[in-house]
């Protein structure tokens, strides 16, 4: 589209991102038909994990990208412009513990510190600093819900859309930290050199 390359997130935001690109006039049929192919040069699309989108956009491998606000908040060092809140894919960043007695609160009372497992160490650290609580952050990559069930941590900070996975693992939300939605981001150089094309995209998205 007007010579622009888009970084497209696979996963939870994938389907709605493709629908949005369809509305912009891009042909996403090949993307929808190929689960394993990642680069679609004719359409100007490259697909990847949401957490990689800011990296590719910052490096100029893509002019524009779509990713969650959670990714941007966890990686503030990425030099990208956040252009638009796209409004879809809402998820809550939450502080959760095992149902029943709040083990995290008990640990704070007894020890002055609680252990919190998360994939989002920066977001978690900033939150507990902001709320005046001592937390030892344990970074994990996989199923965060396991941590309080196995004794690795008293609590977790994680992203949830429906809360189903938390409930199925006997966890309850104690606090909501933030709500994250999909955002449109741009490479700073492309934002200058391809301003007309990018402004057109932003204008059309704002117009719905």
Name every feature range the model reports, one short phrase each.
Residues 1-208:
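Domain-level signature for soluble enzymes in the chorismate/prephenate branch of the shikimate pathway
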């Amino acid at each position: 589209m007007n010579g622009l390359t888009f970084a497209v997130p696979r996963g939870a935001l994938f389907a709605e991102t493709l629908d949005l690109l369809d509305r912009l006039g891009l042909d996403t049929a090949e993307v929808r038909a190929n689960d394993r192919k990642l680069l679609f040069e004719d359409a100007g699309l490259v697909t990847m994990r949401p957490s990689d989108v800011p990296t590719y956009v910052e490096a100029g491998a893509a002019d524009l990208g779509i990713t969650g606000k959670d990714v941007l908040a966890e990686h503030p060092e990425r030099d990208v412009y956040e252009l638009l809140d796209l409004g879809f894919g809402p998820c809550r960043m939450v502080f959760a513990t095992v149902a029943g007695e709040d083990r995290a609160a008990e640990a704070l009372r007894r020890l002055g510190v609680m252990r919190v497992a998360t994939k989002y160490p920066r977001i978690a650290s900033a939150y507990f600093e902001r709320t005046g609580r001592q937390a030892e952050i344990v970074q994990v990559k996989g199923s965060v819900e396991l941590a309080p069930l196995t004794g690795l941590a008293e609590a977790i900070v994680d992203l949830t859309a429906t809360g189903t996975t938390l409930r199925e693992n006997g966890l309850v939300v104690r606090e909501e930290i933030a709500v994250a939605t999909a955002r449109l981001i741009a490479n700073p150089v492309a934002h200058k050199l391809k301003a007309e094309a990018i402004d057109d995209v932003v204008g059309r998205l704002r117009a719905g």
